[in-house]
Amino acid sequence: MDQKILKAYGAAPKTWLWQLLAAFIVACLLAWSGTAVRVSNPTSNGLEVAGNIISGIFHPSGKLLFTLGTNGVPYLLLETFCIAFLGTIVGAVISLPLSFISASNLVPKPVALIGRVLIAAIRTIPAFVYGLMFIRVTGPGPFAGLLTMSLCSIGMVSKMFIESIEDLDKRILESLDAAGCTTFQKIRYVILPQLTADFTSTIIYRFDMNLRDATVLGLVGAGGIGAPLIFSMSSYRWNEVGAILLGLIVLVLIIEWISARIRVKLARG
């Protein structure tokens, strides 16, 4: 056995020279690109500023962290959570019928193509653009963030739903066709019972994404904790930045733990 391995290894083409040449070329390109790096207008007290930032972040403002008013971290985190949660739910509800009319194994291909083009168009536009558009329509606030999260969720959730539907065993659908079942009956009695776990897992995953996106959308005034975060950074109140970041970390860890528990239960059936 060892002789066969050695013989096969000896007969293998020697590519080390090409690999060495490729590594040399990449190293030369990196060195050449490094010559273009310029530090423009460095501040004389840059290290002191960096120290103040780190010190403020690691010494968060207890007043902001534990205040229960509308300016406190708990309220802002709750608002961010609600924007992400409701946006995910609304997006999933809209995605469900949209995915059914876009699955080529359920509807005629021209109809499925129209649905896929619509989903692709929704997914093309970034969340920031949607946020700015809805802020112009509804004004700054959580409702603009909710609409943005809902629309952004439709693109991804619909795509994942369609993939799950089209991965179904074709023999099951063919047997239902032979039995004279309508499309609605296929969805009601076969697709939904089989794919509930997959759909739920997709919704949970999208909620995790929306929770982070809702924070970023706050930077453009679409509600949530993002706006106070950018205001504190602009005013150099680093202890408030630390309090907000600490609250976000705790919220994300809690959501991750709950999501993991739900996924385990779904996997076990």
Where are these regions (language model features)?
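Cytoplasmic-entry segments and transmembrane alpha-helices of multi-pass inner-membrane transporters
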Residues: 98-131, 160
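Generic hydrophobic transmembrane alpha-helix motif, especially the helices
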Residues: 119-153
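Hydrophobic positions within alpha-helical transmembrane segments of bacterial inner-membrane proteins
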Residues: 84, 88-96, 100, 104, ...
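Alpha-helical membrane-interface segments at transmembrane helix boundaries
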Residues: 74-82, 115-122, 204, 208, ...
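N-terminal, non-cleaved signal-anchor transmembrane helix
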Residues: 1-89, 101
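Glycine-rich helix-loop "coupling/hinge" segments at transmembrane-helix boundaries
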Residues: 136, 212-248, 267-269
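Membrane-cytosol interface at the C-terminal ends of specific transmembrane alpha-helices
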Residues: 140-191, 197-206, 257
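C-terminal transmembrane helix and the adjacent membrane-cytosol boundary/short C-terminal tail
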Residues: 201, 242-269
